[in-house]
Amino acid sequence: MSKTVVKKNESLEDALRRFKRTVSKSGTIQEVRKREFYEKPSVKRKKKSEAARKRKFK
């Protein structure tokens, strides 16, 4: 869980920008999108092997 405390003399826009940066670095949004729908184990394995193949030939 990302937590951002608004500092003294810091605008809300700056705090929001800092919060968005921490959330994107932690990968929370990607994790939520990945878990949004159920994925069969066979599909997970297929995606994992395709990603490994892409990394290998890149």
From Swiss-Prot:
GO terms for biological process: translation. One of its GO terms (molecular function) is structural constituent of ribosome. Keywords: Ribonucleoprotein, Ribosomal protein. GO terms for cellular component: ribonucleoprotein complex; ribosome. Pfam families: Ribosomal_S21. The keyword Transmembrane does not apply. InterPro entries: Ribosomal_bS21, Ribosomal_bS21_CS, Ribosomal_bS21_sf. It comes from the Bacteria. Belongs to the bacterial ribosomal protein bS21 family. This is Small ribosomal subunit protein bS21. It comes from Staphylococcus saprophyticus subsp. saprophyticus (strain ATCC 15305 / DSM 20229 / NCIMB 8711 / NCTC 7292 / S-41).
